[in-house]
Each structure stands twice: as C-alpha cells, then as structure tokens.
C-alpha cells in the first residue's frame, strides 16, 4: 500500500513498533509534525484489514491505538514506489484479561498477550512477509505462539498458524478468542479452577409469585395499635420501665411495667364531661338560685 509521501522519513526501520505515542522515531528538526501522516497510514491500514476480513467496522485506528496500551508492528518495503516506500502489512498485539476453559473444563483467569489484528496487503501475500512480521513480534515480546490468544482469527490466519507454527488443536471457548492446547501447559494448577456445573432451570410454578407476595406481606409489621385484619393482634408497646425496675445485672431480663388499660367513658347525647371544678360551680349556682327563690316567698 503506497502513500503520496515519503514513508522512509516516517518509518526509518524496516519494521517499526508504534505505541500510543504514534511515533516510530525522533522528530527531525525543521520538519513538519509527522503525526497527521502517521495517523492516515494507520487508519487506511485498519480499513483495508476490516475489508479483507469482512468486518462491519475497522478494529484498528490511530485513535484506538492512542487509547489503549497496544503495540503495532508495521512492515515496509523502502525501495518500492520510486524510493518512497510502501507499507506491506501490520500486526497489532496487546494484553487482555480473559476467562478461559481448558480441555478438562477448568476455569482460568489470565491476561495473556493477544493478537488483535493481522494484515498483509493482498498483492504481497505468500512472499514470507507475514512470517517475517510475526517472528519479529515473537522475538520482541519474548513469547511463544502457543502462549498467545487470538482474537477472532480468520480461516486464512488459522491456516497460517498451523502451517508456520504447527498450531492445530484449538480449545473451544465461550468468547471470540482462540487458544491452543499448549496455552495451558505453562499455567500452574493453582491458576486453574473447576467451574461448578450449572443448576438445571426448573419450571416456575404458577402460584410461586403469589406465595412470595404473601411472605413479603407477612414480613411487614404495622405499628401498634394498627392491627392487621384477620391476623393475630400485636402486643402493645412496652411502657418505659422505672429506674427501680430496670435490671443492671448481666444475664437478667429487664422487668416489665404492668399494663393498665384505660377505662373508656361513654357520654350520652347532651352530656358534658364532669370534673371536680365543674361540680363545685354547679353546686354554687344551685345554692344561689334557691336563696333567690326563698326571698320572694
């Protein structure tokens, strides 16, 4: 893939390693900022890779590389395109936290180095460029192909791994990553945890929801003296105990004050509640009335 500017000035090495800084070397004094051109190269490579893999959207871009701790290995041929160079392909790797299953069903939580995207220009495939790029990454990361995980590898990529690195027996996973049998050989038994079998889902009874509602209602306690209709009456709250009746010894129960039900007074129509003051006033008015009546006789 060629571009309308000198790629040798952007990427001085045959294989350049880019990280979130998007810089493959030192910025030359007096030259314009190479970041816009590097961004264009990465974005166009990501689009070409997604088109070759028939993906709905690119998984490699300059913005995504800046936002993650990934490494992009970019391979060029500096003699092509009139000495300005062409991009042959790229390989993107990064560490991912994964939950994997081995051949026995044991569960492993690990964070391996993963191949996230791999692309070689269609016209330059089957010339050994892919092997050169992949071998450079393995040496740079000091890792074996079987120790890595592969994110949604295409059939062509799986054929490349089998032919070049003898990776044949993949272990089925519940996610989009592919690992091979050798991946679990370097993991200790402490890292492996047997996954408990899932409980069979039983049929939900039609009255189970009603029963749960009844239990939930029974757990609610209304404040005294509001008593639930149809239910057993709740005891009235305890009166605060006097200092003499409160127990201070460890292990003894506090004494309860005796309950004194208040007597209800029923008033007939026309009656008013009586009190000593009212009775005294009524007696005085009656005595005065009697004396006034005697004076007229």
UniProtKB/Swiss-Prot annotation:
Record's subcellular location: Cytoplasm; Membrane, Clathrin-coated pit; Cell junction, Focal adhesion; Cell projection, Axon
Keywords: Acyltransferase, Cell junction, Cell projection, Coated pit, Cytoplasm, Cytoskeleton, Membrane, Transferase
GO molecular-function terms, A-Z: L-lysine N-acetyltransferase activity, acting on acetyl phosphate as donor; tubulin N-acetyltransferase activity
Biased composition, class Polar residues, residue ranges: 266-278, 286-297
Lineage: Eukaryota, Metazoa, Chordata, Craniata, Vertebrata
UniProt record, GO biological process: alpha-tubulin acetylation; microtubule cytoskeleton organization; neuron development; regulation of microtubule cytoskeleton organization
Enzyme Commission number, as recorded: 2.3.1.108
Annotated protein name in UniProt: Alpha-tubulin N-acetyltransferase 1
Compositional bias annotation for Pro residues: 230-240
């Amino acid at each position: 893939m060629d571009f309308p500017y000198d790629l040798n000035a952007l990427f001085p090495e045959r294989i350049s390693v880019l990280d979130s800084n998007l810089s493959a070397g030192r910025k030359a004094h007096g030259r314009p900022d190479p970041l816009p051109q590097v961004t264009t190269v990465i974005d166009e490579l990501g689009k070409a890779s997604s088109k070759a893999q028939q993906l709905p959207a690119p998984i490699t871009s300059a913005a995504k590389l800046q936002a993650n701790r990934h490494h992009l290995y970019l391979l060029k041929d500096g003699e092509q395109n009139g000495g300005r160079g062409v991009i042959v392909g790229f390989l993107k790797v990064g560490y991912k936290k994964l939950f994997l299953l081995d051949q026995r069903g044991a569960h492993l939580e690990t964070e391996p180095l993963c191949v996230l995207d791999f692309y070689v220009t269609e016209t330059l495939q089957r010339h050994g460029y892919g092997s050169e790029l992949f071998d450079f990454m393995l040496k740079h990361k000091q890792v074996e192909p079987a120790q890595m995980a592969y994110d949604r590898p295409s059939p062509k990529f799986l054929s490349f791994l089998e032919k070049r690195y003898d990776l044949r027996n993949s272990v089925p996973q519940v996610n989009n990553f592919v690992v091979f049998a050798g991946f679990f050989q370097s993991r200790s038994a402490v890292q492996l945890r047997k996954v408990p079998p899932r409980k069979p889902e039983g049929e939900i009874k039609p009255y189970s929801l009603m029963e749960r509602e009844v239990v939930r209602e029974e757990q609610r306690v209304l404040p005294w003296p509001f008593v639930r209709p149809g239910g057993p009456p709740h005891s009235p709250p305890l009166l605060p105990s006097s200092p003499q009746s409160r127990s201070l010894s460890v292990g003894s129960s506090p004494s309860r004050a005796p309950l004194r039900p208040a007597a209800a007074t029923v008033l007939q129509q026309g009656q008013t509640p009586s009190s000593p003051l009212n009775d005294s006033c009524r007696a005085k008015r009656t005595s005065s009335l009697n004396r006034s009546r005697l004076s007229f006789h």
